[in-house]
Amino acid sequence: MKVGSLVRYIRDPDMFGVIKEREKFQFITRNYILWNDGYPRIAARLWFDDCELELLSDV
């Protein structure tokens, strides 16, 4: 996985995002709530380990 890849959180298949930073963890800034409903206050910035993410589209 690299910056710009589209990923999905394995434990919650409805939650997906774009990798914005490449470090030990992947930084997800948007999820399905923000993209579909437009409520940025609900879309928290979260950190995930690589093993918790499924790669949907690689750049």
Where on the chain are the PLM-derived regions?
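Basic/aromatic-rich interaction segments and small domains that mediate binding to polyanionic partners
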Residues: 2-57
